[in-house]
A protein has these predicted regions:
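Intrinsically disordered, low-structural-confidence terminal and linker regions
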Residues: 17-20, 60, 92
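Aliphatic-rich helix starts adjacent to a transmembrane/signal segment
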Residues: 40-61
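Short, glycine/small-hydrophobic-rich surface segments
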Residues: 70-112
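A generic secondary-structure signal for well-formed alpha-helical elements
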Residues: 40, 64, 68-75
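N-terminal leader/signal peptides at the extreme start of proteins
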Residues: 1-16
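Long, compositionally biased eukaryotic signaling regions
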Residues: 109-114, 122, 126-127, 134, ...
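Short, surface-exposed interaction loops/tails
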Residues: 127-277
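N-terminal single-pass transmembrane signal-anchor helix
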Residues: 15-45
Length: 277
């Protein structure tokens, strides 16, 4: 009896693995689950991309508006998305579209921006003229200083805007399509003037109404923040559709810049989210 009991326990211990039939059943179940889950992965990634982008855009706009109410003006030291040559940075994906153009500020534009609190911007640079031996990044450190988060960056790079400052302009068609803004509230026949700056980590919003500037989360390898400028753009109006300068620039909204097809707003991404199957 004792020998039989010991032998029985020995048999149970030896049979710790699965039989061939059990393995086949498990593999069939795993294959079936993979057939269900794998087709959903691209959709899940795009949903994560669209929902994150929409949330970040809305939160950025809230932070800008809160800053304006607290400090009676819009933030300084936003990223100027043109290079020293006056052209749109090559790594600004939306700059490849017809939505954006290089635009030189007029006296009226400068006055409107200054009256709204925007007096200084941070120029960004191409990689070839950027840091040497430092950590240049199209998103996290697109400036000409020699190290990431350099303590002297603002003192060195913060540049007053003037009539010689080239910035990124936004077409009336793009603003109307994405932000629902029509010049003079009637038509797009006479376009208003819109300019755009990037919301980087060094803006005067940091530590006040914003802990860190949001970064675009993309669903493709070409839209990652190590490839393109992954911050969000803030659009301001400086003149109305009749060419009359605004007394102070008006904040229009926040847009995503990581798509070569053009700018997009929160609603655009939410629409994509709900159209996915």
């Amino acid at each position: 009896m004792r020998f039989s009991s010991l032998n029985s326990r020995f048999v149970r211990r030896c049979r710790a693995g699965l039989t061939l039939m059990e393995l086949v059943v498990v593999m069939v179940i795993l294959i079936a689950l993979a057939g269900i889950v794998l087709p959903l992965l691209p959709s899940m990634l795009t949903r994560a991309h669209t929902s994150t982008t929409a949330t970040n855009a809305v939160e950025a706009s809230k932070a800008v508006q809160l800053y304006y109410n607290l400090y009676s003006g819009y933030p300084n030291n936003l990223d100027n998305l043109t290079t020293g040559s006056g052209t749109i940075a090559s790594y600004l994906a939306a700059g490849q579209s017809t939505d954006l153009l290089a635009y030189t500020l007029t006296t009226a534009d400068v006055a409107a921006l200054n009256n709204a609190g925007i007096t200084n911007v941070l120029p960004i640079v191409e990689n070839t003229t950027g840091t040497t031996g430092g950590f240049w990044s199209p998103t996290f450190n697109p400036y000409s200083t020699t190290s990431l988060m350099n303590a002297t960056l603002l003192a060195t790079n913060s540049t007053p805007i003037s009539t010689s400052t080239s910035v990124v302009g936004v077409t009336q068609q793009a603003v109307t399509r994405e932000l629902g803004m029509i010049a003079n509230g009637t038509s797009t026949t006479n376009p208003a003037t819109y300019v755009m700056f990037g919301l980087g980590d060094y803006s005067s919003m940091a530590g006040r109404t914003l802990e860190e500037a949001p970064v675009h989360f993309d669903d493709s390898s070409t839209g990652q923040p190590n490839v393109v400028y992954g911050r969000f753009g803030l659009v301001f109006q400086t003149q109305d559709g009749s060419g009359t300068p605004l007394v102070a620039a008006k904040f229009i909204g926040t847009v995503d810049l990581a798509d070569a097809d053009g700018i997009s707003d929160a609603s655009d991404h939410l629409q994509t989210y709900y159209q996915l199957k």
